[in-house]
A protein has these predicted regions:
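Short, intrinsically disordered, charge-balanced linker/junction segments flanking boundaries
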Residues: 190-199
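Trp/Phe/Arg-rich N-terminal binding region typifying the photolyase-homology
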Residues: 20-186, 191
Length: 199
């Protein structure tokens, strides 16, 4: 009798839950462009395609003359701005836009994340030690998940047949160990992107 009552309560519960539509939480992503200013072969941008909305951001470094960092030279600055304009036009053709801001990531990005109620930050990881430390510092300042994916590399670190401790000292031994490895296939530019979030 107890088993029958239990089965009836389970049937009633399953009949009740079949009328409930699961609630899906909207995900707002922020893609922070750094050095990879293209839509094609961009794994970090491709990882945002499932988001409900996407905010694309680029941060211009702020000149710091007091520590002898005066910013970019005139030619490099012009090249960067032309590249950003081209990226913006490509994004606009997909219903997106590029927000270009100035300042350090650990100060600017948390404010942007709060203003637009971002749920997830995506950016590229770079192999430099200082760059890795800067990403770790930024991650410690955020209250949301941050994903940093490798971009514009011929190989992924997991493909190498040696550890960092066994890294070849010169190029020829390195070349012999990696020349048989498959190069990571390129990714096409997305046909569509999630829309920007409402301000």
């Amino acid at each position: 009798m107890a088993v029958l009552r239990h089965r009836q309560s389970v049937d009633a519960a399953s009949a009740y839950t079949s009328y409930i539509t699961p609630v899906r939480v909207a995900m707002r992503y922020l893609h922070w462009f750094q050095t990879d200013l293209r839509l094609d072969d961009n794994p970090t941008l491709s990882s945002t395609l499932s988001a409900d909305s996407l905010l694309c951001v680029y941060l211009l470094p702020k000149p710091r003359p007091w520590c002898n960092l005066v910013g970019l030279g005139a030619q490099r600055d012009r090249f960067l701005r032309e590249s950003l304009q081209e990226l913006r036009e490509q994004l606009q053709s997909l219903g997106q836009d590029l927000m270009v801001l100035e300042g350090s990531p650990e100060l600017v990005l948390p404010a942007v994340i709060e203003r637009f109620e971002i749920d997830h930050l995506v950016t590229e990881s770079t192999p430099g030690w200082h760059e890795s430390q800067a990403l770790n510092h930024l991650r410690s300042k955020l209250e949301i998940p941050m994903t940093a994916l490798p971009g514009n590399h011929l190989f992924q670190a997991a493909q190498f047949p040696f550890s960092l401790d066994e890294y070849p000292d010169t190029f020829s031994p390195f070349r012999r160990k990696v020349e048989a490895l498959a190069i990571t296939p390129t990714l096409p530019a997305p046909d569509a992107l999630p829309p920007p979030p409402a301000a």
